[in-house]
Regions:
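Intrinsically disordered, low-complexity coil segments
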Residues: 115-130
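Conserved short histidine dyad/triad with adjacent acidic residue
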Residues: 24-28, 41-57, 95
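A short, N-terminal "cap"/entry segment at the start of jelly-roll beta-barrel domains
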Residues: 1-37, 131-161
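Short acidic-glycine-tyrosine-enriched beta hairpin
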Residues: 76-93
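Short beta-strand segments
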Residues: 52, 80, 129-131
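Ligand-binding loop in jelly-roll beta-barrel domains
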Residues: 92-119
Length: 161
């Protein structure tokens, strides 16, 4: 049997490079459990912090489970206060857009789960993920972890002729 991991007690670490408002602490659970097809991370948010900007995925499905606290979810229908035990699924595409923010006065702890895309980079074997950030008109391609403005798009033949 794989050694169990307690998601309530797993140690989380902050990102020293995170800008104000995105200083949540996290622990990636997938590697700790040896997972290959499902990703999972625990996030702990202080009041005023968000996990990441409003976004949606084009290559993976994400799930959110609230462990403690009352985070606020922004989705295409607006903002909603969540409670411990709430479980949601964000499908691929614009309908699955979301952002999780702690607007309460106490810490929030959540788990985010995601499928891992099967399409992989030939050289490294890394999965390819494509994330869209509607508020900032960006698209992110992982790897290599670059973000681009959608409005900077070029034609198919640009630079080829």
């Amino acid at each position: 049997m794989t050694e169990p991991l307690n998601i309530f007690g797993v140690a989380v670490e902050g990102d020293a490079d995170a800008p104000a408002g995105y200083g949540c602490r996290t622990a990636e659970l997938g590697p700790l459990l040896g997972a290959e097809r499902l990703g999972a991370s625990v996030y702990e948010l202080d009041p005023g912090d968000s996990v990441c900007p409003y976004h949606y995925e084009n290559t993976e499905e994400e799930w959110l489970l609230v462990l403690t606290g009352t985070p606020t979810l922004r989705d295409p229908e607006g903002e909603h206060e969540l409670a411990p035990g709430d479980l949601l699924c964000f499908g691929m595409g614009p309908g699955g857009a979301h952002k999780v923010t702690n607007r309460s006065d106490a810490a929030v702890r959540i788990v985010m789960l995601s499928t891992i895309p099967e399409t992989r980079i030939a050289d490294s074997g890394d999965p390819i993920t494509i994330t869209v950030y509607p508020d900032s008109d960006k698209v992110s391609v992982w790897p290599p972890g670059k973000r681009f403005r959608m409005s900077d798009g070029v034609g198919y033949w640009d630079g080829e002729l």
